[in-house]
């Protein structure tokens, strides 16, 4: 269940103020049959092969190789693309940014049983071209402490924090923060600022814990989605990476399969 520390909000003045103060917001954009439909779309994408223009990433687990992430799927799945670029999600992103929003990037994290977690980090250092973004984690399956739910730090999103050589938050700062786990039920969405510190543990449960993570920027700064993916792949190529990373920072703690 959602704890009292993380109440769910309807997006309005109170919710926007909560986001501005704390750097996160829990909402409920889906219900009932909508959740089942979204789950079926993710099931479809999981079955895509590795030869398309979308980006699949795989990790090694104690249960064998598993898909850990898919990116750049919006152009190839009309229904999911529409869900992420119109309607309640875009409206919420616009409200939190204070102006019309546009999709910047999207990913699905599958977090299979035995799948790796993510080290404490902020998203902003991995995002190019613009200063402020807002992301959300839409739970496809219940995201619980037992399967590696997100943990956040409230009211710590005013600046980019000191980082180590991997681009993650330094151990000294990590130890100084109060980290709070946020359990997010299927169909709920946890919104967070691009500078909100967050992390997640490995999935020690016997089942996957999937989530979609769309990120939005202010439309006034441009539609930069294609440029983001071009830049990401170029930076991977320049660094000689052939599937050894999922991010432009070193936050993923799983064992990648190249």
List each model region and its residues.
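Non-heme Fe(II)/2-oxoglutarate
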Residues: 2, 39-40, 48, 52-55, ...
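Double-stranded beta-helix
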Residues: 17, 143-201, 221, 233-240
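Short, structured patches in soluble enzyme cores that scaffold and shape functional sites
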Residues: 107, 122, 138-142, 154, ...
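Active-site glycine-rich loop that binds ribose-phosphate moieties when present
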Residues: 118-122, 138, 169-176
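A short beta-loop-beta micro-motif enriched in histidine and acidic residues
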Residues: 121-133, 177-178, 184, 207
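Short, conserved beta-strand element in jelly-roll/cupin
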Residues: 128-145, 215-219
């Amino acid at each position: 269940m959602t704890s009292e520390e993380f109440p769910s909000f309807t997006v309005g003045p109170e919710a926007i103020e909560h986001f501005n103060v704390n750097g996160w917001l829990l909402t409920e954009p889906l219900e009932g049959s909508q959740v089942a439909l979204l789950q079926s779309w993710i099931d479809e994408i999981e079955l895509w092969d590795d030869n398309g223009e979308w980006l699949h990433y795989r990790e090694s687990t104690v249960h064998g190789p598993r898909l850990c992430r898919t990116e750049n799927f919006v152009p190839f799945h009309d229904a999911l693309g529409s869900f992420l670029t119109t309607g309640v999600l875009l409206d919420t992103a616009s409200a939190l940014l204070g102006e019309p929003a546009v999709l910047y990037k999207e990913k699905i994290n599958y977090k299979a049983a035995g799948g790796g977690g993510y080290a404490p980090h902020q998203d902003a250092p991995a995002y190019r071209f613009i200063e402020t973004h807002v992301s959300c984690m839409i739970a496809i399956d219940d995201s619980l402490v037992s399967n590696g739910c997100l943990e956040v730090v409230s009211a710590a999103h005013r600046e980019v924090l000191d980082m180590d050589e991997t681009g993650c938050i330094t151990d000294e700062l990590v130890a100084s923060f109060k980290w709070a786990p946020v359990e997010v039920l299927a169909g709920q969405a946890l919104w967070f600022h691009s500078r909100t510190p967050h992390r997640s543990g490995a999935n020690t449960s016997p089942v996957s814990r999937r989530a979609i993570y769309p990120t939005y920027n202010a439309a006034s700064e441009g539609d930069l989605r294609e440029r983001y993916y071009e830049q990401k792949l170029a930076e991977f190529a320049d660094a000689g990476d052939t599937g050894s990373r999922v991010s432009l920072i070193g936050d993923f703690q799983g064992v990648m399969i190249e």
